[in-house]
Amino acid sequence: MARVLITGGTGLVGTAVKNLLLQKGYEVVLLTRSTMSKEGYAHWDINAGTIDATAIATADYIIHLAGAGVADKRWSVARKQEILDSRTKSSALLVKALEETPNKVKAVISASAIGWYGPDKNSHSNNAHNNDIAAQGFVETDPSYPDFLGTTCAAWEASIAPVTANTNGLQKRLVCLRTGIVLSKHGGALKEFLKPLALRMAAILGNGKQTISWIDVRDLAKMFVYAIENESMSGSYNAVAPVPVSNKTLTKTLASLLYGKFYMTAYVPSFILKIMLGEMSIEVLKSTTVSPQKIQDAGFVFDYPEISKSLSTLDL
C-alpha cells in the first residue's frame, strides 16, 4: 500500500487522519521535531531548515498539517508571527526538499482554513437554521480578506503552491482544504464550548446569531483521504459541513444532549469577550458562512452533514 508522510500528525486533525489511513491499509510516517529514532517517525527542523531526505524519497503522498494553533494563545505580535511562520516556513521546507530530493510523491494535500474569508457579505447569517444557507456562502474563488487570518491563509496557500511548478522534483498535484471549525470530542473548539457546560451553563457568545461553518473531525479526516485517492481533485476546496449553525444553536444543542432541559442559558456580552480575547474576539463574534458545494461536486459525501448527527455520535 502507498506511504503517506504527514506533517503536524500528532495534532487533533493529524491523529484522526493517521488513524483513518492506517485503517485503510496505508503506511504512515509522521514528520516530527523529536530526534528520537522510532518506527513510523521521521525528523525535521523547520527553524534549521533540515528534513529527513529518506522520508521524502519514500513517500507516495504528503499531507501537510503543520502550524501553530490559531486559538491556543492570545494574539500578541510575536504569537501572530509564530502562527504565520509555522505555516509558511514549513511549506517552504517541503518545497525545497521535494525539489532537491529524487522522489515519487504523487500529490500534496495541505491544510488551509476558512479564515481566508472575511465576515459574511449578506445578512443571511441570521438564518443559519436554513438547510440551503451554505449555497449562499463564500466559495473558493472569493478573494482572501485583508485581516490577520485572511492574509495568513493567503500566504499559507501561496507558500505550498510551488509544489505544482513545472520543474524537476515538483510538478505535484496540490489540494488545499480550507477547514472550518473542527468538532471533536478530543479537543479543539468543542472543548471550549463544553467548559461552561460543566456547570450546566450554556454560554452564548454575543447575540448568538453569528454563523459557524463547522466540520466533524471524522468527515475532515475522510476528506483528506478522499483528496489522496481522487486524482481529479486539485486546487482549493472548502472543508465545511453542508448545514452551518448559529453559535446559539450549537451551544443549546450541546446543552440539550448533555442535560435535556435541565440547564441554564447565559449570554456573554461582546465587550467581555473583547477584554478576554483581545483581537481574537472578532473571530468568535463574526459570521462566516462557507459553501462546500465544490467538494460535493467532486463526489465527496458527508457522513455528518448536520450538527445534531455530529454531536449525538461524538460520545461526549
Report each predicted region and the residues it spans.
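NAD(P)H-binding glycine-rich loop region in Rossmannoid oxidoreductase-like domains
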Residues: 40-93
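Conserved Rossmann-fold NAD(P)-dependent oxidoreductase catalytic core, especially the SDR/UDP-sugar
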Residues: 92-147
